[in-house]
Structure formats: structure tokens, C-alpha cells
């Protein structure tokens, strides 16, 4: 079971977050392939999301396999320079690696690749539940609308 929280940034070194933590990005903009249950919903994929009653402090997919995804629809073209990830609050649970995809129509997605590489970049996750920033070089200029 993987836990994942992140923030999308507009300027290196992540000085202008897009709003995953502050909720500028609304719950309706966040979807996922599956959720463990309502207490581990996609809308809980926010940095520093705190456990609150039944809410468990992170998104968790129903299945532990490579076919799980989480999507943030930004609504317009956005320059993305990095992604911050974080494990589940107050627990020793986190994603160990992930791949990033982007789209300009929400239907056709492209894997993020580093310059000169033909294979999708596998982003490593930290080995603890503290926040970790992963730069996107080159930056991504288009995301789902």
C-alpha cells in the first residue's frame, strides 16, 4: 500500500507552489485510479495533511501495483519545475518510486523523460515520510486541463 502527497511548483527552487497544500487546488481537481477507502481518498494527497478523525493523512490506492495513479487537473497550461512528495503523516508508509505523466487534453498522456532519454524517468521517493523535492528538468509546460 503506497502513500503519496505532493505539491506542484511554478518556479525553481519551488518558491511558488501551485496550491496542493493550501487548497488553492480544489478537491474536485484531484482524482485517482482507486482509493483504499473513503478515509484514504485522493483529496488527501496534500503535503502536511493531518489525520483527522477517520481521515488517515494520505491517499492510498486500493491495489499495490504499478497501474495506480493520481491526477491533478490544473485547468490551464502550467510550467512545472518540481514535485514535492511526502509519506503518510505520523506513519512509516511512503511511495518508493513513481513516474510522472502529463497531458494537454486529459486523454492522451506522455511520460516525463529527461533530455536525451528514451525511457520514462523513474523518480525515487525518500526512504522515510519526510518531504522530498524532485526537480523536473526540463520543466513540463503542459498539464491536464
Give residue spans per PLM region:
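Disordered, acidic Ser/Thr/Pro-rich linker "stalks" and the adjacent N-terminal cap
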Residues: 4, 8-75, 88, 115-117, ...
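Residues within well-ordered beta-strands of beta-sheet-rich folds
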Residues: 71-73, 82-86, 101
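Alpha-helix boundary/interfacial micro-motifs
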Residues: 50-51, 83, 94
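Trp- and acidic/polar-enriched beta-sheet ligand-binding modules for extracellular glycan
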Residues: 57, 64-69, 90-145
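Exposed beta-strand and adjacent loop surfaces of beta-rich binding modules
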Residues: 27, 80, 95-99
Amino acid at each position: 500500500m503506497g502513500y503519496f502527497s505532493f505539491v506542484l511548483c511554478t518556479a525553481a527552487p519551488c518558491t511558488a507552489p501551485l496550491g496542493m497544500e493550501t487548497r488553492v487546488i480544489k478537491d474536485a481537481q484531484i482524482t485517482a485510479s482507486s482509493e483504499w477507502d473513503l478515509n484514504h481518498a485522493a483529496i488527501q494527497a496534500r503535503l502536511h495533511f493531518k489525520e483527522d478523525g477517520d481521515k488517515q493523512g494520505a491517499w492510498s490506492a486500493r491495489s499495490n501495483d504499478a497501474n495506480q495513479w493520481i491526477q491533478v487537473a490544473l485547468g490551464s497550461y502550467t510550467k512545472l519545475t518540481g514535485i514535492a512528495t511526502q509519506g503518510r503523516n505520523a506513519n512509516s508508509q511512503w511511495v518508493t518510486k513513481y513516474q510522472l505523466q502529463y497531458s494537454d487534453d486529459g486523454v492522451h498522456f506522455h511520460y516525463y523523460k529527461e533530455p536525451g532519454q528514451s525511457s520514462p524517468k523513474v523518480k525515487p521517493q525518500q526512504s522515510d515520510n519526510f518531504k522530498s523535492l524532485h526537480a523536473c528538468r526540463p520543466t513540463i509546460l503542459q498539464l491536464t486541463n
